[in-house]
């Protein structure tokens, strides 16, 4: 019995440390973007597929997420497109498109929300401790504008509230804004 407990303990430590090691890479990739000047620009553009991206000096909130995941080897452009192609009727129809579009679908926050929901990544809970580094959060900004950001591994100066890495219009920033707008989603996405 003692031997089984030792193996179980080692397995838990290895599993936990592997999960921890993955998250900081995503946060680091997002934080790296805060060092670059990026003009907030959601203009439709034709981009390559797979691994397509708009110019690195342009982007919106979703581009912070897409670029961070891409830096750790996960191409959300492909994953979202493949799921939309197979399940187009389960995605938002607000754009009135007849089929998926690899140029823009992955850059739309409602599509990312649906993708993460379908991937089983939604997290419940709303206290500061429920938000872990690398988690994704979506908000609804004034004017019904959806927004997305990545939870940082850093905390605000006056509380245990985590900072958020996002682009709300002035380029990628790491800021204390988790509760600044109504939260519409909380996700912890890992590729299966």
Spans of model-derived segments:
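Positively charged n-region of N-terminal signal peptides that target proteins for export
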Residues: 1-6
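Soluble non-cytosolic domains of exported or imported proteins
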Residues: 21-25, 52-63, 106, 125-128, ...
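Sec-exported extracytoplasmic/periplasmic mature domains
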Residues: 31, 35, 66-74, 81, ...
């Amino acid at each position: 019995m003692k031997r089984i407990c030792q193996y179980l303990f080692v397995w838990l430590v290895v599993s936990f440390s592997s999960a921890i090691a993955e998250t900081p890479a995503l946060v680091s990739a997002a934080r790296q973007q805060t060092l670059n000047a990026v003009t907030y620009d959601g203009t439709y553009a034709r981009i390559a597929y797979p691994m397509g991206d708009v110019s690195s000096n342009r982007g919106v909130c979703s581009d912070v997420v897409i670029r961070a995941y891409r830096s750790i080897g996960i191409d959300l452009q492909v994953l979202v497109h493949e799921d939309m192609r197979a399940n187009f009727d389960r995605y938002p129809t607000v754009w009135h498109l007849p089929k998926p579009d690899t140029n823009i679908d992955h850059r739309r926050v409602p599509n990312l929300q649906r993708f993460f929901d379908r991937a089983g990544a939604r997290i419940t809970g709303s206290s500061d401790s429920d938000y872990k580094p690398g988690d994704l959060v979506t908000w609804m900004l004034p004017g019904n504008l959806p927004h997305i950001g990545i939870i940082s591994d850093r905390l605000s100066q006056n509380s245990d509230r985590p900072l958020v890495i996002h682009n709300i219009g002035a380029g990628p920033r790491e800021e204390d804004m988790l509760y600044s707008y109504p939260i519409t989603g909380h996700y912890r996405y890992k590729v299966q």
